[in-house]
């Protein structure tokens, strides 16, 4: 059994055969068997829609679909017989995931799944939180609560509130943020910094702090990426509430980054520091000693830094963003040797090509993540280098990082081809991870919406099509961690879980939130509603820009406060002058695209 993704080129109803062409230009003849099923793409919580009786109307030239079937070797070739077909819309150029509300409804469903999985139907009590969640949403017996996974779920719940206005999601985000502050945060008053524990081990009424990482790659060290993602959820919550305690935590954690992780002379940030001296050059760090990597430099922007800037407009955040993006543009490309960026470095930026599991391998999604975030930054601080690198990545990635027959994006591949090889070899497998599909969708959506181009929009649609067809779990809820190359779910080991060290609603929610923003304001040109709930002690200037978007691409059209129209706002700068209040204000804004 295998999958073909492509576009109908012709259909012979009498013979029950149609031709389709893939993104690579290969043509396949598809035989429709009598027991073949056909359906319309559906979202989480939507019913199955049978399309079998409408095949003559739907198998028209240009229709985009997935076909799952069997290749039978026969004669000098093969016969491909379809067993399942999924149509992405009702006619050519029609994509269900571009309809208004698709990603909002998906995020609403995700939030409902994780709310039930972690807290059941009762009160929200983070003492019950578990890092590992089974396929069906059942909590495991593991009592280690990892800081980053809580923060990632908080991010998801905050994002769900921003799109739906459901107070329950904000309650979960705020309680999670407070739980992180109360249990996972260490305040070093002597050095005026904050850092975050790896997690806590909960046993009855007792908890044991886990200061250093328990993850194999980072064991007994303080990795930069764990400190970064500890800020993800609280920062997204800060955008909604303006809670000054959160902004203080952001600034004090950034002081940790500047004082102990930053390489002031050489540029960038080190990936790990030791837990005693807080030094990146201590021998106890072993293979992580004096190293820099993608996470330590590139993950600041999407995890918290862009959102901190959106919430405040403060120059210190923009300046750090510019520094990190300048560093990426200067040191990460390696196009004389590979179509993939290099991701690991020594202090002097020479390439570390033998580091643990990665060696000289590329994480496909990190390349796409660079393109996506460069285009975000380019809207605030335009630079030719940012735009050029983002466009280059967008152009060269599909043939080396994506599946040209089945759709979707691969995981980890060798950066170099050996003599005689035509394809970059897979590191371990040809499976496809949910978060890498997210990077592709967002990268090509923002490229399509900013620099334009039919190719970018086509790549965005193909990536979103694969994700929505194969990653949504219509039986248990939420999304799968990994699928096989064909799109079938891969349900072994930790990849069977819906919650783990690597998965806790963050990437799936980020995708829903930003796909809504980019699709509405840049692609289909539809209004976008967002919700905020600033505290009485928050700044009286509420910034409601949904992301770093090109100047003049949207404006603030309407504002409601506590359900009533409110007129004191700046349409062009997307800010609201809040009235004084002794209570939190419920603010709903509508943003509209500007042609």
What kind of feature is each model-predicted range?
Residues 1-595:
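Glycan-recognition and catalytic cores of secretory/periplasmic carbohydrate-active enzymes
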């Amino acid at each position: 059994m295998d999958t073909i993704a492509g576009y109908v080129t012709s259909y012979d109803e009498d013979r029950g055969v149609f031709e389709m062409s893939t993104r690579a230009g290969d043509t396949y003849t598809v035989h429709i068997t009598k027991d073949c099923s056909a359906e319309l793409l559906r979202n989480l919580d939507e019913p199955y829609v049978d399309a079998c009786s409408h095949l003559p109307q739907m198998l028209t030239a240009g229709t985009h679909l997935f076909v799952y079937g069997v290749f039978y070797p026969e004669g000098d070739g093969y016969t491909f017989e379809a067993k399942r077909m999924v149509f992405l819309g009702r006619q050519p150029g029609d994509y269900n995931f571009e309809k208004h509300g698709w990603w909002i409804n998906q995020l609403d469903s995700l939030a409902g799944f994780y709310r039930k999985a972690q807290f059941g139907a009762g009160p929200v009590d983070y003492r019950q939180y578990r890092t590992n969640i089974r396929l069906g949403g059942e909590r495991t017996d593991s009592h280690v609560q990892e800081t980053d996974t809580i923060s990632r779920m908080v991010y998801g719940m905050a994002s769900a509130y921003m799109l739906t206005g459901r107070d329950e999601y904000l309650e979960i985000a705020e309680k999670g943020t407070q739980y992180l502050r109360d249990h996972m945060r260490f305040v070093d008053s002597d050095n005026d910094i904050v850092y975050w524990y790896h997690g806590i081990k909960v046993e009855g009424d007792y908890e044991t702090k886990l200061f250093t990482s328990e993850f194999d790659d980072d064991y007994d060290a303080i990795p930069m990426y764990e400190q970064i993602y500890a800020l993800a959820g609280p920062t997204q919550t800060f955008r909604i509430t303006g809670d000054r305690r959160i902004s203080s935590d952001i600034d004090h954690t950034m002081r940790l980054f500047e004082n102990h992780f930053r390489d002031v002379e050489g540029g960038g940030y080190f990936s790990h520091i030791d837990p005693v001296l807080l030094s990146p050059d201590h021998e106890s760090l072993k293979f992580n000693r004096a190293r820099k990597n993608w996470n330590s430099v590139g993950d600041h922007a999407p995890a918290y830094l862009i959102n901190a800037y959106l919430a405040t407009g403060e120059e210190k955040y923009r300046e750090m963003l510019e520094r990190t993006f300048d560093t990426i543009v200067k040191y990460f490309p390696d196009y004389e040797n590979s179509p993939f960026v290099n991701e690991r470095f020594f202090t002097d930026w020479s390439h570390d090509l033998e580091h643990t599991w990665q060696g000289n391998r590329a994480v496909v999604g990190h390349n796409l993540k660079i393109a996506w975030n460069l285009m975000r930054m380019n809207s605030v601080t335009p630079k030719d280098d940012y735009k050029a690198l983002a466009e280059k990545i967008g152009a060269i990635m599909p043939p080396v990082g994506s599946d040209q027959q089945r759709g979707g994006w691969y995981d980890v591949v060798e950066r170099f081809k050996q003599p005689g090889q035509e394809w970059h070899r897979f590191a371990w497998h040809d499976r496809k991870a949910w978060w890498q599909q997210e990077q592709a969708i967002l990268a090509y959506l923002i490229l399509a919406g900013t620099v334009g181009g039919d190719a970018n929009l086509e790549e965005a649609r193909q990536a979103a099509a694969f994700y929505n067809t194969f990653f949504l779990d219509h039986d248990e809820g939420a999304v799968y961690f990994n699928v096989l190359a064909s799109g079938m779910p891969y349900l072994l080991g930790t990849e069977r879980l819906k919650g783990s060290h690597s998965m806790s609603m963050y990437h799936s929610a980020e995708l829903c939130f930003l796909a809504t923003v980019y699709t509405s304001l840049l692609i289909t040109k539809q209004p976008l509603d967002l919700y905020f709930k600033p505290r009485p002690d928050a700044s009286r200037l509420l910034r409601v820009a949904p992301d770093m978007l090109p100047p003049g691409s949207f404006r603030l059209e309407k504002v409601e406060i506590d359900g009533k129209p409110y007129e004191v706002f700046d349409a062009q700068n997307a800010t609201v002058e809040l009235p004084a209040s002794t209570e939190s204000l419920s603010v709903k804004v509508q943003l509209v695209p500007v042609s």
